Amino acid sequence: MADTIKHTPMMQQYLAVKADYPNQLLFYRMGDFYELFYEDAVKASELLEITLTARGKSGGNPIPMAGIPHHSAEGYLAKLVKLGQSVAICEQIGDPSISKGPVERKVVRVITPGTLVEDALLEDKSENLLAAIFQQADEYGLATLDVASGRFEATLLPDSTQLSAEVERLKPAEIILPDDPLFKQNLPESIQNRPGLVDYPSWHFEKDSCRKRLIDHFGTQDLVAFGCDQLPAVISAAGVILHYAQSMLQNTLAHVFSLQTYQADDALALDAMSRRNLELDTNLTGGKNHTLFAILDNATTAMGSRLMNRWLNQPLRNRDIINDRFNAIEDIIEQHSQEEFRSALKPIGDLERILSRVSLYSARPRDILHLGRSLNQLPELQALLKQQTANKWQQLSKQLGLYPELASQLETALVESPPMLMRDGGVFAEGYDSELDELRNLKNQAGDYLLALEAREKERTGITTLKVGYNRVHGYYIEVSKLQSDNVPADYVRRQTLKAQERYITPELKEFEDKVLSANEKALAREKWLYQQLLERLNQDLQALQRTAAALAETDVLVSLARQAINLNLTRPTLSSEPGIDIKQGRHLTVEALSNQPFIPNDTCFDEQRRLQIITGPNMGGKSTFMRQTALIAIMAYMGSFVPAESATLGPIDRIFTRIGASDDLTSGRSTFMVEMTETANILHHASPESLILMDEVGRGTSTFDGLALAWAIAEQMAQSIQGYCLFATHYFELTTLVEQFNNTVNIHLSAIEHQDKIVFMHQVEEGPASQSYGLQVAALAGVPTAVIDKAKKHLHRLENQTAAQQQTSGTASSAKESVQQFDLFAQPALPEAIETMLTDLKALSVDDLTPRQALEKLYEVTNTVKNASE
């Protein structure tokens, strides 16, 4: 920007502040507006669709300017944050009445996508995470902080693949990275292409300074208790995230009182593509409808919904924790107490986020009202918890806590319907503070005084139309008509002239005005002081209240899962230490919810003889639905939910992989087939015998022979080397012969019936390969013109006749079943007879007994034989 010497004092102040926040939009408070100047104004006018104007000239040039009213700033901020922008809020902190020159201003808050705490800027059912990544050797430290709840976590990841998967699970709104271009280039593309990346000075990641920052914040001697004392990459990531959040919020973040270091392999792993394919909480079009989360989430509170989402996206492998959840759900169902719990949970507010704002001293009066109502519900919830018998309920009962004194204070402190903001006053109830009551009484008695004054003045002046009134601009006044203005007493001082009236003030009315206005100011100041005291009181119990909030959220999730277990006819699964998966009459909840027809349930069975299952059958027959429902049932079981099946027993599962569907990745310049092969390569490199693997139509993105060759080799790798639980759907019928090669492979198919040239999908999984693909019938259902279908039938008939003739010639058509199969791609072609004879002669040849001339003659003979055979 231009040299500040050329600018007015106010613009010099603006430019000095802006220099410290070059990457943020600067909201610069001027009276009742936030103003933006220069490039910020141009950018904001485009993003917010507000008017771009100019504020005179400074330095000889017009200054672009745009502004928004401060009272409606939150709506504009929400829009900017959704667009990935960061905003620095610069407030007036000086008193304009005593300022010489520009009023003193200061940036009090920087709003970034990952540091939101304001209720209007957050989504109720989604976490809003700030993340930081740091690399040490080949390992990555990843830390996340939910500023709005205080949850602080970190983990060490062994490679970039697991880093990518974990970032996809967490979906952070903002990621802090060292400002080293090489570091960013070495990150997975999935992270490089994410919005919200922040380049932060690399020196902030220095391990020793980060360690000290964390130790100082938590008030400990080391980081042993947090499980990361010997993890330098984790320490750097966690230290940076704390520094960044404190800087943006201009706060110490006292509500962040712990750091949890976790192992990524404690949870059932899903890569980014698997999460998308299975539509856990986001559908394939990016929406939230028709997902598993939308089906399962019946939570009463917002924090319960967020915890439900976390459980769904992070299914645990610890069977003890999961069985505790099963027991709690079963207990509440048996005692029929889910509706009582829901009724008791209804008044509970979003305590996690309210308490964070309490800690930051940004809580609004209605936050405190909801907190008070929530505390009043705790005795009822405590009684319900104690009626349950499962261990989990007893643990939650102890964690819940009761706060009778605090609840009573909050109940008596606030009016029944407080204003949105503390600045408006009128927050505290009558009787809470005697000094405030006295100041308010003075204002409340003003009406009686003014009526008495009006009556006295009418009598004194003889002006019967005289009125006493008040407005915010001119204060109290005595109003008479212009016709009567000549009759006013000498002590009447003109205050305002209107078209038909004159307004006056008297010494008595002025004295009263000063007293009332002073009382109003003092009352508002008293309320602000009382509010500050109330927040300080709440902060004394902050950690205990946060534990209470966590207990309420978990209670809500378990009650919700119990309710949905009844509503959706779910069954308690069994988690076994023995390998295998046995699901009886499993269902796909989302498809079932959307369908007007009864859902056809199916069994899934994996054991040592059924590790690889080749699935054939027509398109639209239900192969993908069957595969997805198997994975979704596994995820539900490992998150601690009952499952849609008559029964389900699941052995250990470490990962779920899906290779279902694909499209071009235009941003990275990758074709559909390249995307498919990249996903397949990831599976082949990382799958284990405990992995559940779904592979749909592998190889279809290239030529028939290339695709078949790849599909065959990949299926062989699954059966022979990986030996995971693999559902392998294909239209390559040749793969059904793998059952003859491997004793852990079986064929299954989705049945269909053809009737009068039409196909009826049975959606039933049956043993053995499909008899045909029904491709033409599906095409007809899709509306392909009849003329095209008729031509296709002729071509199909011709191709089948050619295949049958070739098989009869080669002697391979030993049965009617074999005659309709395609050729074995991997059969060795027959050699010409002359070559076979030559090879036999060469095998019998004793090279050591040949003279040089005989050897040369033999070489000529071999050469001629090969040439003749190839012609």
From Swiss-Prot:
Record keyword Nucleotide-binding present: yes
Binding site for ATP: 617-624
Origin superkingdom: Bacteria
One GO process term, biological-process aspect: mismatch repair
InterPro entries documented for this protein: DNA_mismatch_repair_MutS, DNA_mismatch_repair_MutS-lik_N, DNA_mismatch_repair_MutS/MSH, DNA_mismatch_repair_MutS_C, DNA_mismatch_repair_MutS_clamp, DNA_mismatch_repair_MutS_core, DNA_mismatch_repair_MutS_N, DNA_mismatch_repair_MutS_sf
UniProt cross-references to SUPFAM superfamilies, sorted A to Z: DNA repair protein MutS, domain I (SSF55271), DNA repair protein MutS, domain II (SSF53150), DNA repair protein MutS, domain III (SSF48334), P-loop containing nucleoside triphosphate hydrolases (SSF52540)
One Gene Ontology molecular-function label: ATP-dependent DNA damage sensor activity
Entry keywords, A to Z: ATP-binding, DNA damage, DNA repair, DNA-binding, Nucleotide-binding
Keyword Zinc: no
Annotated Gene Ontology cellular component terms: cytosol
Family annotation (PANTHER family): DNA MISMATCH REPAIR PROTEIN MSH1, MITOCHONDRIAL, DNA MISMATCH REPAIR PROTEIN MUTS FAMILY MEMBER
UniProt similarity note: Belongs to the DNA mismatch repair MutS family.
NCBIfam families: mutS1, PRK05399.1
HAMAP family: MutS (MF_00096)
Its biological purpose: This protein is involved in the repair of mismatches in DNA. It is possible that it carries out the mismatch recognition step. This protein has a weak ATPase activity.
Name of the protein in its database record: DNA mismatch repair protein MutS
